[in-house]
Design a protein with these regions (language model features):
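Bacterial N-terminal signal peptides that target proteins for export
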Residues: 1-8
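C-terminal motif of bacterial Sec signal peptides marking the signal peptidase cleavage site
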Residues: 14-17
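Bacterial signal peptide processing site
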Residues: 19-22
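N-terminal export signals and maturation junctions of secreted/periplasmic proteins
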Residues: 47-74, 85-136
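Solvent-exposed loop/turn segments at secondary-structure junctions
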Residues: 95-96, 163-167, 221, 272, ...
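Acidic/His-rich structured neighborhood in mature extracellular/periplasmic domains
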Residues: 113-261
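Flexible, glycine-rich surface segments
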Residues: 211, 215-324, 330
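C-terminal functional modules
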Residues: 315-366
Length: 366
């Protein structure tokens, strides 16, 4: 889904359902200080920056199809799916290594922004206004989908709003280039992206696409809801019985398919109809300092939170599973309490910032 990595604004606009695991960060405050020797982590950071600059200076180039990892990939696909190896080589020979994608992947918005900065960009007045306009335009279909699936229409609209600003920015990278670049030259997550490349090749065959013309995010996410190829194959649905091409799933231009597919994704991940996503809380300072935004698990109960000094208003049962989520404001640390549906949203994009943004945009649209 958002893996969602160049300027902060560009990064935010290119969020996908495939975002990396977020890292805990705090707003950087400039303060006078004496110069001190660089620590190992600072040196490593400097070296990483130099490496990024070096990669960014490279030009796009074709892949060497004699590389052992690419040969193994072709052989595996050919064997598993009965696709002629020569056909696969012909396709992959047209893929291009894109160095800017590698650089972008090192700077996802979830890593470089505090919550209040992230929210300002994704829950802006303009995005709320466009969301209400979008909802009014598609009100009938959204109402039908909500009644059928139990997935809140506001959440469906918010997902599309956060992902692509209601279809305005679906990405300009060739998906083939993105997935080959990350699958063969981004070691940290190469296995994942090679799997997505496999799904993309199969999806293009299933949907009768020209794989050289499909465009998406720099992480390979596609369409208005930014589905990765594996999610497209598994969760995308034909949302209209009267579609002009029955059985085809068009997440680029068909809003019936787009809205129904987002709802289907949430249904498959056990969205609880009518239940809240999160709520605000007053949290003791010692707990705030220990929070880790990489944690996505409902690792506490509401009763345990109350017992630890967390104050909040809720009529939910004491044994309700929850997560305490860091939510920095412009004035300092803060936290919120996420519930089951919050966890479901993080299955779409593994980021607590993303899930909070979707919830807050949805609430602003009501």
């Amino acid at each position: 889904m958002s893996l969602r990595y160049s300027s902060v604004l560009a990064i935010t606009l290119l969020l996908t359902a495939c975002a990396d695991q977020p890292r805990s960060v705090k707003p950087v405050v400039a303060t006078p200080h004496a110069e001190v020797p660089k620590t190992a982590s600072v040196v490593a950071s400097d070296e990483a920056a130099k490496t990024q600059a070096s990669i960014a200076d490279e030009s796009p180039k074709p892949f060497d199809l004699t590389r052992p990892d690419i040969v193994a990939f072709i052989d595996s696909l050919s064997s598993k799916h009965a696709i002629p190896a020569e056909e696969l080589r012909a396709l992959l020979s047209q893929g291009m290594f894109q160095p800017k994608i590698i650089v972008a992947m090192t700077r996802p918005a979830e890593r470089v922004l505090a919550w209040w900065e992230y929210k300002d960009r994704l829950v802006s007045n303009e995005r709320v206004a466009r969301g209400r306009e979008f909802w009014n335009t598609h009100r009938d279909r959204l109402s039908t989908i909500e009644q059928k699936t139990g997935v809140d229409a506001a959440i469906i609209v918010a997902i599309i709003g956060v992902e692509t600003n209601y279809g305005r920015n679906m990405g300009s990278w060739r998906v083939l280039d993105a997935l080959m670049t990350l699958g063969f030259d981004y070691p940290r997550r190469a296995e994942f992206f090679r799997s997505e490349l496999e799904h993309f090749i199969l999806l293009a065959r299933e949907e009768s696409w020209d794989p050289l013309t499909v465009r998406g995010s720099y992480a390979g996410a596609m369409g208005a809801p930014q589905f990765m190829p594996s999610s497209y194959r598994r969760f995308a649905v034909d949302g209209s019985a009267t579609a002009s091409a029955p059985g085809r799933r068009d997440l680029f231009t068909d809003w019936d398919d787009i809205a129904a597919s987002v709802a289907n994704y949430f249904t498959a991940h056990r969205w609880k109809s009518g239940q809240p996503v999160l709520f605000d809380a007053s949290v003791p300072a010692e707990l705030l300092g220990a929070l880790d935004r990489r944690n996505l698990e409902l690792d506490r109960t509401l009763a345990a939170l109350r017992a630890s000094g967390v104050s909040f208003e809720s009529t939910l049962p004491d044994d309700t599973r929850a997560i305490l989520v860091p939510a920095e404001t412009a004035t300092g640390p803060a936290a919120r309490i996420g519930l089951h549906n919050f966890r479901v949203i993080t299955r779409y994009n593994r980021s607590v910032l993303y899930a909070m943004a979707v919830n807050d945009l949805a609430e602003s649209l009501r």
